[in-house]
Amino acid sequence: MSEAIIAKKAEQVELIAEKMKAAASIVIVDSRGLTVDQDTVLRRSLRESGVEFKVIKNSILTRAAEKAGLDELKDVFVGPSAVAFSNEDVIAPAKVINDFTKTADALEIKGGAIEGAVSSKEEIQALATLPNREGMLSMLLSVLQAPVRNVAYAVKAVAENKEGAA
């Protein structure tokens, strides 16, 4: 192999390792058997969610995972592998891919990493069932508002009772 090719591959490994380190979540899938139309729809959905999706050779992924400190991912890099990286939303890649697997049997989640910790296929699928950040914030807000709302209703009821008695 020529020096130029080796240098290019080393650069790819370094780039992918940096993406793995910076990613809030990584989902690795086997996309073998997807039609071109399905692949296009999947990529568009991921892009709209702010997720980067790439098909990368397993040898490059293995070396990049080692550099990123995700050695346990090596077991997942068997057969064709595509990787979804998200730097902001931890749930987005898992949710989009899990939703897509319901319509496309060919797509299979192999594993991933969440906040730098290696995760199994089952953990990624469980993550996909959680609401996104905005959904979680609205749930938290409604939980925080409930006691205040209940006090307001109680005060209103007392005021109405006093008006009715007067």
From Swiss-Prot:
InterPro entries: Ribosomal_uL10, Ribosomal_uL10-like_sf, Ribosomal_uL10_bac, Ribosomal_uL10_bac_type, Ribosomal_uL10_CS_bac
UniProtKB keywords: Ribonucleoprotein, Ribosomal protein, RNA-binding, rRNA-binding
Top-level taxon: Bacteria
Keyword RNA-binding attributed: yes
GO biological process: translation
Molecular functions per Gene Ontology: large ribosomal subunit rRNA binding; structural constituent of ribosome
Classification via Gene3D superfamilies: 3.30.70.1730
GO cellular component, as recorded: large ribosomal subunit
Keyword Ribosomal protein: yes
PANTHER family reported for this sequence: 39S RIBOSOMAL PROTEIN L10, MITOCHONDRIAL
NCBIfam families: PRK00099.1-1
Assigned protein family: Belongs to the universal ribosomal protein uL10 family.
Function: Forms part of the ribosomal stalk, playing a central role in the interaction of the ribosome with GTP-bound translation factors.
Subunit relationships: Part of the ribosomal stalk of the 50S ribosomal subunit. The N-terminus interacts with L11 and the large rRNA to form the base of the stalk. The C-terminus forms an elongated spine to which L12 dimers bind in a sequential fashion forming a multimeric L10(L12)X complex.
Descriptive protein name: Large ribosomal subunit protein uL10
Organism lineage: Bacteria, Bacillati, Bacillota, Bacilli, Lactobacillales
